[in-house]
Amino acid sequence: MKKNFSRIVSIVAFSSLLGGMAFAQPAERGRNPQVRLLSAEQSMSKVQFRMDNLQFTDVQTSKGVAQVPTFTEGVNISEKGTPILPILSRSLAVSETRAMKVEVVSSKFIEKKDVLIAPSKGVISRAENPDQIPYVYGQSYNEDKFFPGEIATLSDPFILRDVRGQVVNFAPLQYNPVTKTLRIYTEIVVAVSETAEAGQNTISLVKNSTFTGFEDIYKSVFMNYEATRYTPVEEKENGRMIVIVAKKYEGDIKDFVDWKNQRGLRTEVKVAEDIASPVTANAIQQFVKQEYEKEGNDLTYVLLVGDHKDIPAKITPGIKSDQVYGQIVGNDHYNEVFIGRFSCESKEDLKTQIDRTIHYERNITTEDKWLGQALCIASAEGGPSADNGESDIQHENVIANLLTQYGYTKIIKCYDPGVTPKNIIDAFNGGISLVNYTGHGSETAWGTSHFGTTHVKQLTNSNQLPFIFDVACVNGDFLFSMPCFAEALMRAQKDGKPTGTVAIIASTINQSWASPMRGQDEMNEILCEKHPNNIKRTFGGVTMNGMFAMVEKYKKDGEKMLDTWTVFGDPSLLVRTLVPTEMQVTAPANISASAQTFEVACDYNGAIATLSDDGDMVGTAIVKDGKAIIKLNESIADETNLTLTVVGYNKVTVIKDVKVEGTSIADVANDKPYTVAVSGKTITVESPAAGLTIFDMNGRRVATAKNRMVFEAQNGVYAVRIATEGKTYTEKVIVK
């Protein structure tokens, strides 16, 4: 193995030219602090890049010692045989329909002479050892010009749900291999503006509102995003989930769906064979698209229930993908919907995945001290060709430090050489809540430790289940001839109790060496709330946003990694990091059958409070300023019990009974002071001296009137509310 050592660029001769450029300071993880949005107008944004933490690493090549440059957030996407010249990328929200252009407003640079920049090894797979791949000088080293040429470019536009975006790329290092001159741009200011020409990958229909649940994602992805550009949809932070289930498991999914509704996520079931028979990937993709495009239905999560032979992954050359089902708007690789899978070959396989998910969200207490403990696993390989020029061990050390700063109380490090399966088994059985793995892999095992599917039966971590960010080859290839590594961990149980993991993101193909490291970095940074504008609380939200950062920086290779990095488990899983604390929740013990709202007091802002009736959601609200006011979307019957459920990040879940009292529809069934009739798609309501209101299934008011109302409805479920003679009645109406 070649020895690499860092050599910090000399700045003595350049000190008067740097203009504030920061060299050789310990780089804070995350985004380059020297990249700023200078201005954002309707049709133009200005962005300033300034060099940060430029360093050089010496490597041995066929031409002698050459240098590999790195700087904060710089990414090497150079083609094999061309000079290694990292770029930095930022995403901007742009016009929905116009083509964009980038212009350099100003720039400053210095030059370093007699420099030999090493050639790129290209995209390296984690099926290979980077140290065994030689540096090969390509034809570009004979060309008397600066590479890559332009210091600022635009990538193809992409669409993220309601917003069209475009990535601006800075190439601050320009190298002439004939004269051996390295031009270092210390500052670049660009303007990205609209043109009069029609653009590519446009948004054809601009909504007059945007789903609130993606606001933080927009703010994180786009430098210039402003929430005021749209009117947020009211009270829709949690969105909606559809469970697409193979027919043979339809009767086994009820407990999961009931719990999801109970904890505040509106969840529906669709039998896969009712979409198409036989079930095809194209049919699944089209169904998800149709559900996403339904007006007012904020589809956010899709959970596939079944193995590949039940609900197939989308297969294209070199790709086996569930994630593409969530890529709906435009022709890019940014998901609008978070996708996950309970991969199962038996009812027992499914039951343990349901049980572990419900227990994790519902039953964790202050006695679960295993939370806040993490495991970091790394190979002994990597280095200059990897993300940030890090070896796998350096990469995992950075993650370990981040977790410690956040509050994790114990970090177990299993680094090669010498890691054994027993090291991993002992770590799991001792209690851990998070695993980060970076190394080699196979369909059935981790390369570091050789812990694999044959060792899973030795796990005894009953309901002390970590989630896993896995950077490795084919650990998630659920099309393999036997259960893959990720499937084995999700199906594991001991004496009927779940063991293994509660969720894992793992690849169906050989992963690239560098780009998933950037995705894994971002996942951990989001988990540890490093980015205030990108706070995510679900496994799907954390992992997908981590991959967005990877795609932004690694372009086509990042897209391929995103498409094949598969979520095994519930994408809406509310993740836990530290030992939970208790919430103080107070609410009335009773509710009137005619009530329209229900108020809950809670000392944790951001908690989700939900009233449900035997797995049917009655209403839900977010705790703000110490209270949640739940609007009741469904009729409730007298002398029954509702369930109040309050969930919060790193909190003990609170569940209380609420008794229904007072006048209900059932009490006046034979003497109703109103009539409700449905004919085709027409709802007719009549009642003297009454206020009439119709709500759709999401609780949105769609019609109001006095005394008489005729409403033309779409297919769906509606609540008709009649207020008359001091009483309020609610009836559920189904339009087919």
Swiss-Prot record:
GO molecular function: cysteine-type endopeptidase activity; metal ion binding
EC number(s) on file: 3.4.22.37
Chain positions recorded as Ca(2+) 5 binding sites: 613, 639
Catalytic EC class: hydrolase
Gene3D superfamilies named in the record: 2.60.40.3800, 3.40.50.1460, Gingipain r, domain 1, Immunoglobulins
Annotated signal sequence range: 1-24
Positions of Ca(2+) 3 binding: 390, 395, 521
Catalysis: reaction(s): Hydrolysis of proteins and small molecule substrates, with a preference for Arg in P1
Gene Ontology CC annotations of this record: extracellular region
Residues binding Ca(2+) 2: 329, 332, 334, 336
Keywords assigned: Calcium, Hydrolase, Metal-binding, Protease, Secreted, Signal, Thiol protease, Virulence, Zymogen
Binding sites annotated in the UniProt record for Ca(2+) 4: 522, 525, 531
Entry's localization field: Secreted
Protein family: Belongs to the peptidase C25 family.
Function: Thiol protease. Acts synergistically with RgpA to catalyze the maturation of fimbrial subunits, such as FimA. Its proteolytic activity is a major factor in both periodontal tissue destruction and in evasion of host defense mechanisms.
Protein name from the UniProt record: Gingipain R2
Organism: Porphyromonas gingivalis (strain ATCC 33277 / DSM 20709 / CIP 103683 / JCM 12257 / NCTC 11834 / 2561)
Taxonomic lineage from the root: Bacteria, Pseudomonadati, Bacteroidota, Bacteroidia, Bacteroidales
